[in-house]
Amino acid sequence: MFQNADEAKKLIADEDVKFIDVRFCDLPGVMQHFTIPASAFDPAEELAFDGSSIRGFQAIHESDMAVRADLSTARVDPFRRDKTVNINFFIHDPITGEQYSRDPRNVAKKAEAYLASTGIGDTGYFGPEAEFYVFDSVRLANSATESFYHIDSEAGAWNTGALENNRGYKVRYKGGYFPVPPVDHFADLRAQISLELDRAGLQVERHDHEVGTAGQAEINYKFNTLLAAADDLQLFKYIVKNVAWQNGKTATFMPKPIFGDNGSGMHVHQSLWTGGQALFYDEAGYAGLSDTARYYMGGILKHAPSLLAFTNPTVNSYHRLVPGFEAPVNLVYSQRNRSAAMRIPITGSNPKAKRVEFRAPDSSGNPYLAFSALLLAGLDGIKNKIEPAEPIDKDLYELAPEEHAGVPQVPTSLPAVLDRLEADHEFLLAGDVFTPDLIETWIDYKRTNEIAPLQLRPHPYEYEQYYDV
């Protein structure tokens, strides 16, 4: 919104803005904020906060951190009562003035600079497609004496026998793709979200009900450069959740909220450009792909087992990545084939539209780190001319066992991908984009705060299985 500090001050005064919402991203990927009066905001000044209270940041004995405004990200918040402008900030060390190596937005900024320094290209475009579910309610409890979750949705397949306010038109399990209303209960909600996205500067291309029951949805908007695309995704999630909340609903981007139905993924479309020219198109190549694009895919497929530590970084991610629910578990590439982890969309002969789509990711993690890791893996493939295995255009779910045995698969758990990241992360250190400290912190955080607590707790299904042993 703002190009410089003077422009920011003028607009804040002219538009009678009351508050500035200071936003930055924690290490796991959740946006944080604090709010200051607009009258106290000086775009040129740093603001301080306690880094020891932010997940994945500082220890208590070195907790002071500072943020500096990225004025290009300023947006009026449509959900606040008093006029508020949200601005994303970069994090700095207040003593040295250096950019903080664990600041996810700084990682994305360094990734873009590294791309330009390689001479391969000057711009990377990323287009995530984040699916989500819409529920009426969610209840959960975890204590020493109880553990459960309960979700409900007026459109849920499990509510066909509900006694009250049941007018039918429930969405069957794995049967939600493209039905018209009244089976599609949430067309108006998605339309309202789409209008808010457009007002926020995200150009919506389409919205639809996805395959899952209970309001699973997808809203696609225009791609962007790496850092901006990650900012856009955080803004997208903020708008989706708040519009749902305003309508008495609750939205979740959890990868697998419903057992027995499709999970929610985040397919990521990617392309490289230089001097305004697309680098991924060659009409003579398979599916119209250039050598550069093929090597880029080769890098991602080679490093995928460690990449998933950033693109699929939760325990719940691996409940989605199982055969039978349209999940891309096969580490191969193909034209059109949605059972492959890497797909080349049909885009005709337009070089500018040629891109590759990595289908494994979900949106439970940190988009700044995920997109940066994907770019670095792809660039490693280009620099080292990593050839992917031959494309497979068959339905990979229907291969004979002997054929399927030769197809590489994604790892099946978060501990497995963290082990792979520990062994394979040199490509992430290029250009000092990721630091060894960041990678070590990420692995330790996931093991300590997400894996270990689950290992300590009995699961409700264990009672069903083992109570009467």
Curated annotation (Swiss-Prot):
Q: Name one Pfam family in it.
A: Gln-synt_C
Q: Provide the positions where the record notes the PTM O-AMP-tyrosine.
A: 397
Q: Which is a GO BP term held by this UniProt record? A: glutamine biosynthetic process
Which sites bind L-glutamate? 262-263, 320, 326, 338, 359
InterPro entries for this protein = Gln_synt_N, Gln_synt_N_sf, Gln_synth/guanido_kin_cat_dom, Gln_synth_cat_dom, Gln_synth_gly_rich_site, Gln_synth_I, Gln_synth_I_adenylation_site, Gln_synth_N_conserv_site
- Which reaction is this enzyme known to catalyze? L-glutamate + NH4(+) + ATP = L-glutamine + ADP + phosphate + H(+)
Which positions in this protein are listed as binding Mg(2+) 2? 131, 210, 218
**Predominant place of localization:** cytoplasm
Q: Where in the cell is it found?
A: Cytoplasm
The protein's matches in PROSITE patterns, at most eight in alphabetical order, are given as: GLNA_1, GLNA_ADENYLATION, GLNA_ATP, GS_BETA_GRASP, GS_CATALYTIC
Cofactor: how bound: Binds 2 Mg(2+) ions per subunit.
Under which name does UniProt file this protein? Glutamine synthetase
